[in-house]
Swiss-Prot record:
This is Putative uncharacterized protein YIR017W-A. It is a multi-pass membrane protein. It is found in: Membrane. Keywords: Membrane, Transmembrane, Transmembrane helix. Completely overlaps MET28. It comes from Saccharomyces cerevisiae (strain ATCC 204508 / S288c).
Length: 199
């Protein structure tokens, strides 16, 4: 059922923008309101602004204004950086992985979440990266105790939306290495980036 829903572009765009809306909520501290209200306000603002930003990238891709090799290199770098950051349990991992999730659906990939062998890998990597993110003990020392409920709400929302772009990033990672074109690279045959017609 989840694979069926992910086959629709609108559903993928919605997940990407929702995850990216939670990415920078800690950097906004100028609002004179509760943490929960501030987080919801930032989510709405990021959702609207990044929706227009993503459509601009989609417009450039359809008009062939950007070379496919540029998107290929960008996508590879984002996969590597987000995977390492999440696996190491970094505190800012939700920022990078959310950017990855918002970028991938608009880079023209025709094979998105279609690898059958990727789901066991998702479960293993998600379980290994969940412990350092969910068991952080420094959150209660940073914030005042009067807003403990709001703080817990924000921490849980950040960690929850960390795993959504992480799954998307690992899906693209597995999909890339399972593609037949990658077998030619392993056999030391030269391949030009323009041959990656599947981008």
């Amino acid at each position: 059922m989840f694979r069926l829903l992910m086959s629709f572009n609108n559903f993928k765009d919605l997940i990407s923008l929702m995850s990216l809306s939670f990415a920078f909520q800690n950097s906004f501290s100028l609002f004179n309101c509760s943490i929960r209200s501030r987080s919801l306000l930032i989510c709405v603002f990021k959702f609207c602004s990044l929706f227009m930003f993503s459509k601009f990238f989609c417009f450039l891709r359809m008009r062939n204004r950007c070379d496919a090799s540029v998107f290929f290199l960008l996508r590879s770098c984002l996969i590597l950086s987000s995977s390492l950051e999440v696996l190491t349990g970094a505190s800012s991992s939700f920022t990078t992985t959310a950017v990855v999730a918002a970028t991938f659906p608009f880079l023209g990939s025709r094979s998105f979440l279609n690898c059958e062998t990727s789901w066991p890998l998702f479960i293993m990597l998600m379980s290994s990266s969940a412990l350092p993110l969910l068991t952080s003990s420094n959150d209660s020392k940073r914030e005042p105790s009067s807003e403990s409920l709001d703080i817990r709400f924000c921490r849980c929302s950040e960690r929850l939306f960390t795993f959504i772009p992480f799954l998307l990033a690992m899906s693209m990672f597995v999909d890339f290495f399972s593609h037949p074109c990658f077998a030619l690279i392993l056999t030391n045959k030269t391949i030009c980036l323009r041959n990656y017609h599947w981008l």
